């Protein structure tokens, strides 16, 4: 999500993984805000999941850092927001948490601690 860096999109990360000795043992942590800032349109969930699957494979996602985005889509800026209070929005997070539950992928919140409890409750509500 920071722009001109290696691994800014998942196809670059897939290329790195495929060059290690045991690529089957390597997975990724997918950050919702970083990916949104890098051009992954979480508000268009189905197409984004298809894009991720085509670039790296959904099975490579081992963990999700759940953060909304203070910045616009494809901004190339790393600015986290609390769930539902940013540009990704609650509808997209409803799809993301349901996907994580279906695939048994853990999620970690990285926003300030004062509101983490509220974020957790919102994610549980969106999931169910």
Question: What are these model-derived regions, one by one?
Answer:
Residues 2, 115-116:
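Alpha-helix N-cap/loop-to-helix initiation residues
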Residues 65, 107-108:
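Conserved beta-strand positions in the central sheet of alpha/beta enzyme cores
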Residues 85, 108-112:
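Charge-rich, low-complexity N-terminal segments
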């Amino acid at each position: 999500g920071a722009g001109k860096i290696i691994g800014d999109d998942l196809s670059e990360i897939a290329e790195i993984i495929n060059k290690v000795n045991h690529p089957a043992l390597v997975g990724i942590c997918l950050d919702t805000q970083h990916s949104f800032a890098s051009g992954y349109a979480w508000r268009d969930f189905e197409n984004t999941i298809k894009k991720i699957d085509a670039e790296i494979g959904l099975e490579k996602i081992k963990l999700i850092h759940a953060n909304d985005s203070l910045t616009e889509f494809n901004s190339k800026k790393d600015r986290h927001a609390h769930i539902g209070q940013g540009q990704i929005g609650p509808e997209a997070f409803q799809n993301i948490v349901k996907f994580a539950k279906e695939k048994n992928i853990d999620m970690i919140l990285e926003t300030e601690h004062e509101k983490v409890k509220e974020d957790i409750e919102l994610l549980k509500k969106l999931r169910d």
